[in-house]
C-alpha cells in the first residue's frame, strides 16, 4: 500500500506542476504580445570604439544627447541622432533588442543603451513607445 500512496502522490504532484507550467507559459506569452510595437528612437553611430567612448563620456557628464549626436555621430547627425518612429522588425536585430528594452527618456537626461552591430558602435536612447 505504501507504494500505491507514493505513486498517487507523485502523479498528483506532477499533474499540478504541469498545470502551473501551462498557466505561467500563457502569462509569459501574453506579456510578450503586450509590449511596445514601435519606438521613437535616437542613436549615435561611431565606427571606432574610442570615438563611441568619448561620446558616452560626454553624455554621462550631462551633455545633451542631441548635441553629442551632432558632434560625434556618423549617421543622422543633423537630426540629433533621431531615427524617428520605428516598428518592431524594421531595425537591425541586435540594435532592436537593446532599443526596445530601454525606458523612455529625454535628450537632456537620457537612459542609454549600447550595442555593436555590423554598422559600428551605437549609443541608443528612446523618447517614446507605443
UniProtKB/Swiss-Prot annotation:
It is an enzyme of class 5 (isomerase). Residues 36-128 form the PpiC domain. Its EC number is 5.2.1.8. One of its GO terms (molecular function) is DNA binding. SUPFAM superfamilies: FKBP-like. The keyword Isomerase applies. This is Peptidyl-prolyl cis-trans isomerase pin4. It comes from Neurospora crassa (strain ATCC 24698 / 74-OR23-1A / CBS 708.71 / DSM 1257 / FGSC 987). The gene is ppi-5.
